[in-house]
Amino acid sequence: MKVTLPAFEKARVLVVGDVMLDRYWVGPTGRISPEAPVPVVRINQIEDRPGGAANVALNIAALGGKVQLSGLVGQDDTADALTRGVQALGVEPHWLVVEDKPTITKLRVLSRNQQLIRLDFEEAFDKHSSDALLNQAQARLDDVDVVILSDYAKGAVGEPADFIASARAKGVKVLVDPKGSDFARYRGATLLTPNMSEFEAVVGTVTSEADLVDKAQKLLQDLALDALLVTRSEKGMTLITPNAPELHIPTVAREVYDVTGAGDTVISALATALGAGAELPQACAIANTAAGVVVGKLGTSTVSRIELIEALKSHQGESGIGVVSEDQLVYALEQAKLRGERVVMTNGCFDILHAGHVSYLAQAKALGDRLIVAVNDDDSVRRLKGDGRPVNSVDRRMAVLAGLASVDWVVPFSEDTPQRVIARLLPDLLVKGGDYKVEDIAGGAEVIANGGQVKVLGFEDGVSTTAIIQNIMSRH
C-alpha cells in the first residue's frame, strides 16, 4: 500500500473525553501465597502513563500534531500525575475538576510481561459535569481543525449532539471513538471508529462482508454520518462512505503483544492525518499502519512519526501481491484508486529478463505508485515470435517479474495484443517501450477516453532478448 505522510505539524486537534491514568506495578513472581492460591508479586517498578482520551492526545503529540485535551478529573494526586504526564509530552490539558469524584485510574499488576490483574478506581461522572466539560470545549473550536470525542462510557462525553453540531457548523471535523449500544448520541459526526464488537452491538450480528457494508450504509444514513471506519482486529479495517465502494485495508501488524490502546492509536493517527490535509483513504491507511506498530508494544503506548515512517518503509518494501488473475486485479485496482494511488501499466513478452527490461520497468514505476505488467502467454508469444519461443514458460516469466521491486502486479493475457485487458483495467497511465507512436499503442485509445494518459519510454540501446538468444547460439 503506497502511503505518503502529510506534514503532521500542521494538524490542530482537540481531544474531549474520558481521561484516566494507567498505573503499572511490575515485578517478579516465584511463589504462591500461603493465604490464598494466588501468585505473590514482589513489586520493583511502578510506572504511570496517561490513558483513555489522554493516550489519544499523546499519540497526536508523538506524531507531531498540536493537541489540546479536555477531560474530567478529581481533586487528587492522580490528577496531578496525569497533568505532569501529558504536559511532559507536549499536550495542553484543560481539566474540569469534579471535587467529589476520583480521577479514573486503572491499576495493572504485571509479571514476566503478563498482566495478572487489573484494579479500577472510578466513579461515573454525571450529566451536569459532562455538559460543563462540553461547554468548556466548545470555546476552543475556533483554534482547531479536528475534534476527537474519546468515549469510554465514564460520563465525560455524555450527550454531545449540540457540541457536534457546533463543531460541524464551524467546519471542524468530528471523529468519535464510540462506546455502548446507542450510537444515536453521535448523530451528525464526521466519522465513527467502532471495533467489530461495538459495531455489532448496534446493528446486530454481521453474517458476511456484504452484510457488513449494508448495515454500515444504513447506519450512515440513519445518523447522518460522513463515514464509518470499522476496525476488525486481524482483518484490518473497513472504511464505508455513502455512495462509494467500501475500502478494505488489511492489517500490517507483525507481532501482537498487547492491544491496550490500539483504538486510541487508530483515531489519533486518523485525526492527525486529516488535520494535516490527508484525504480520508490515505488517513485510514496511516491509522492502520500506526495500529500495527502499537500492538507490538506492551501496555498503553504511543507511535512516533519515526516509527510510522519505518513501518511504512518495511510494509511498502514488499513487492505487492505478485501474480494475479484479472478478476483479482480488478478488485485490487478499485482499492488502489480509492486510496488515491496512481496506477501505471505496461505489457510485453519478457521472455528472457535482462538489464534493459529492469531499467524500463523502474522508469515506468517511477511515474506512479503502482505498476501492472501484462504478460503474453506462451501461445501468444509463439504467434508473435515464431517457433522456439518462448524460451521460458509464462509461469516462470511472471514469477521473475513479480520478484522485481518495481513491479506490483503481473497478469497474463492470451490475445496477440493487450487491448482487451487494458480496456478492462483502465490504468491512469499506460506506458510502452520503443519507438511507437501514441496512437498506435494497443489500449491507448481506451485509456485516454477514460481520462488517462499514454507515454512512450525508450529502451536501453544494445540490449534485447533476440540479441541475447543470437549471442548464445553463436557461441554454441
Swiss-Prot record:
Q: Give any Pfam family that matches.
A: CTP_transf_like
- List residues traversing the bilayer: none
Q: Which GO terms describe its molecular function?
A: ATP binding; heptose 7-phosphate kinase activity; heptose-1-phosphate adenylyltransferase activity; phosphotransferase activity, alcohol group as acceptor
Region Cytidylyltransferase: which residues? Answer: 345-476
* Alphabetical keyword list: ATP-binding, Carbohydrate metabolism, Kinase, Multifunctional enzyme, Nucleotide-binding, Nucleotidyltransferase, Transferase
Q: What class of enzyme is it?
A: transferase
InterPro entries the UniProt entry points to: Bifunc_HldE, Carboh/pur_kinase_PfkB_CS, Cyt_trans-like, PfkB_dom, RfaE_dom_I, RfaE_dom_II, Ribokinase-like, Rossmann-like_a/b/a_fold
| Pathway(s) the chain acts in | Nucleotide-sugar biosynthesis; ADP-L-glycero-beta-D-manno-heptose biosynthesis; ADP-L-glycero-beta-D-manno-heptose from D-glycero-beta-D-manno-heptose 7-phosphate: step 1/4; Nucleotide-sugar biosynthesis; ADP-L-glycero-beta-D-manno-heptose biosynthesis; ADP-L-glycero-beta-D-manno-heptose from D-glycero-beta-D-manno-heptose 7-phosphate: step 3/4
Its cellular-component GO annotations read:
cytosol
Keyword set includes S-adenosyl-L-methionine? no
Q: Might you give the EC number(s) for this enzyme?
A: 2.7.1.167, 2.7.7.70
Q: Where is the active site?
A: 264
Report the record's Gene Ontology biological process terms: ADP-L-glycero-beta-D-manno-heptose biosynthetic process
For the ligand (ATP), the binding residues are: 195-198
The question of whether Kinase is a record keyword is answered with yes
Query: Source organism's superkingdom?
Result: Bacteria
Where do the record's region annotations for Ribokinase lie?
Answer: 1-319
Q: Which reaction does it catalyse?
A: D-glycero-beta-D-manno-heptose 7-phosphate + ATP = D-glycero-beta-D-manno-heptose 1,7-bisphosphate + ADP + H(+); D-glycero-beta-D-manno-heptose 1-phosphate + ATP + H(+) = ADP-D-glycero-beta-D-manno-heptose + diphosphate
Q: Which family does it belong to?
A: In the N-terminal section; belongs to the carbohydrate kinase PfkB family.
Task: Please describe the quaternary structure of this protein.
Answer: Homodimer.
User: Tell me, what does this protein do in biology?
Assistant: Catalyzes the ADP transfer from ATP to D-glycero-beta-D-manno-heptose 1-phosphate, yielding ADP-D-glycero-beta-D-manno-heptose.
Q: What is this protein called?
A: Bifunctional protein HldE
Organism expressing this protein natively:
Shewanella amazonensis (strain ATCC BAA-1098 / SB2B)
Gene (name only): hldE
